[in-house]
Every structure is written in structure tokens, then in C-alpha cells.
A protein has these predicted regions:
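Conserved PLP phosphate-binding loop immediately N-terminal to the Schiff-base lysine helix
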Residues: 1-31
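Active-site PLP attachment segment
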Residues: 23-59, 66, 86
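Residue-level micro-sites within transmembrane alpha helices that shape
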Residues: 1, 25, 35-36, 42, ...
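Glycine-centered loop/turn positions within well-structured domains
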Residues: 19, 36, 134
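PLP-dependent aminotransferase class I/II
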Residues: 6, 10-16, 50-221
Length: 221
């Protein structure tokens, strides 16, 4: 289960049981990259599991494949979280719920503001989930406006990002599968229509108002 951008999010099963993202499957992986909701000061990540056998195998893989020092049972990597990053994350962890709540408040303000225009489709949160808004990403109804909006906002001093502009099936690394443009039309359509606006725990009202004002101004021309 990939929870690189979803740490702290909830998922509610049909029986009413609610669990955290990353604990639904046999194992869940998350990222502690500095920009994440729970970020370290350098690279880092974690895998969560209740399976003792799997946990032992994972600990071995991330430590050069060693079952004990100098004895390599498998091919592994050096993926050990250093003590500095662990100490930072231990302190920040107690603030995670507050971080996520702050992001949700920023997202709700965006959603309310952009509901006033027909040009934007805001993020949807299903009733059985919660959203932690690692990114605030909207869809434009008119894909031809996306790059124009990105350039316009930059000219006004408003950062916006087009994340993951090339879908996996069109990446050179996966070209051996033989997929071509048009094979995954919905994916390609979404890649052409999404754009992300600033969101973080320390965002001030004046900053967000300025962003909203300029986004809406673009669509008023």
C-alpha cells in the first residue's frame, strides 16, 4: 500500500471499522521526504506491517540483505534511517494530526472560493475517507487553459505546480511495454488538466487570499 502522500488519512470499512492509511494491506510504505506532511530534514521513509516474518525480511533487505553482520541471505540495499532523521521525526510525529488539520482548513477555503467558478473541479473526499492534502490539486474543465494559468500565476508571483506531467505508460523507462499515446485516454486527459496550488501548515490568510484572487482573476478575462 503506497501512502507516501497520505500519512494520517483514515479509511472506513463498510462494517464501521476505521483504520489509518498504510495499515490496510499486508504492508504500507510511506515517505519522510522533507516536503511530506511528516517530513524529516533529509531523505527517509518507513514500511509498516503486522507480519513478523515480513518485517524480519524487510529489515534484512534494508540492511544490505544481512541476517546478521557479514552474512547476506539476499541482495539488499543500504536504506537505514539515520538517527538524526529518526530523532526529528519522533518530535514532529506528535504534531502530525495538527499539521493535517491545518492543511484541511486551507483546502476547505480553496474549495469554497473555487466553487464560485465553473472552470475548476475541486478535490472530492469520499464519505468513507479523510483527506490530508499533501498537495492541493484541482482539475480544469478546459485542458487548454492549464499551462496558460501556470504561466499567468508565475507572472503574478504565485507559485503553482504541474506534478507528474508524463504518465507512467509514456515514460521511457516503461517503453518496453509498447504502450503509446491514446492507450490510456483518461490518464492522459487528467495529466493535461491538473494543477496544484500552494498548501502548507503555516499558510497565512493574506497569502491564500492573494492566490485565490489571482486564480479567479485569470478566469474572468
Amino acid at each position: 500500500e503506497d501512502t507516501a502522500q497520505a500519512i494520517g488519512a483514515d479509511y472506513k470499512f463498510s462494517d464501521g471499522n476505521t483504520v489509518k492509511a498504510g495499515t490496510i494491506g499486508d504492508a504500507g510504505a510511506t515517505s519522510f521526504f522533507p516536503s511530506k506532511n511528516l517530513g524529516a530534514y533529509g531523505d527517509g521513509g518507513a514500511i509498516m506491517t503486522n507480519d513478523d516474518e515480513l518485517a524480519a525480511k524487510l529489515r534484512m533487505i534494508v540492511n544490505h540483505g544481512q541476517s546478521e553482520r557479514y552474512y547476506h541471505d539476499s541482495i539488499g540495499v543500504n536504506s537505514r534511517l539515520d538517527s538524526i532523521q529518526a530523532a526529528i521525526l519522533k518530535v514532529k510525529l506528535k504534531y502530525l494530526d495538527g499539521y493535517n488539520q491545518a492543511r484541511e482548513e486551507v483546502a476547505n477555503k480553496y474549495n469554497s472560493a473555487f466553487a464560485t467558478t465553473d472552470h475548476i473541479i475541486t478535490p472530492v473526499t469520499a464519505d468513507f475517507t479523510s483527506h490530508v492534502y499533501h498537495q492541493y490539486t484541482i482539475k480544469l474543465k478546459d485542458a487548454s487553459k492549464r499551462n496558460e494559468l501556470n504561466k499567468y500565476l508565475a507572472a503574478q508571483g504565485v507559485p503553482s505546480m504541474i506534478y507528474y506531467p508524463v504518465p507512467n505508460h509514456l515514460q521511457k523507462a516503461y517503453s518496453y511495454y509498447g504502450y503509446k499515446e491514446g492507450d490510456f485516454r483518461i490518464t492522459e486527459d487528467l495529466c493535461s488538466r491538473v494543477i496544484s496550488f500552494p498548501i502548507h501548515t503555516e499558510m497565512q490568510n493574506e497569502q491564500q487570499d492573494f492566490i485565490i484572487e489571482n486564480v479567479l482573476k485569470f478566469f474572468s478575462y
